[in-house]
């Protein structure tokens, strides 16, 4: 399948790169890091007067996150991870998401394809994993 030039331009730098720190996020969000790691430091800030005690406490902390040169977030869609064609996990439950993350972690992205007529995306990895995304519904495309 021929991939549109814009997708080739975006993904060509990721081909052959191992993903790391693959993890479930909020809801069914799913993130993968690629490339050299760097620290993202969020300095403490002062909350507004009407902020709750919990918010004030959280904003008073310094938060440090490790990110890659490229950050791929799978969000606002249904997704599934397969290993050599067999279902491993999806966004339905945290344990299912964790199984999917564990399988993908360390695998190298080798191919991306997009099926515009169905709005499906397919990410293929070197050790047999496949990550497929589909819209939640046709109206949500």
Where are these regions (language model features)?
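Surface-exposed, interaction-prone regions used to assemble/regulate multi-protein complexes
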Residues: 1-141
């Amino acid at each position: 399948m021929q991939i549109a030039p814009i997708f080739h331009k975006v993904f060509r730098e990721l081909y052959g790169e191992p993903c790391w720190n693959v993890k479930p996020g909020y809801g069914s969000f799913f993130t993968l890091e690629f490339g050299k790691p760097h620290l993202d430091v969020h300095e403490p800030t002062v909350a507004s007067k009407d902020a709750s005690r919990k918010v004030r406490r959280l904003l008073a902390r310094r938060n440090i996150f490790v990110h890659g040169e490229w950050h791929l977030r799978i969000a606002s869609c249904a997704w599934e991870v397969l290993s050599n064609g067999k279902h491993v996990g999806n966004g339905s439950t945290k344990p299912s998401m964790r199984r999917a993350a564990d399988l993908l972690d360390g695998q190298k992205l080798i191919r991306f394809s997009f099926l515009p007529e169905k709005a499906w995306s397919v990410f293929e990895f070197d050790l047999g994993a496949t990550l497929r995304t589909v819209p939640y519904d046709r109206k949500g495309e």
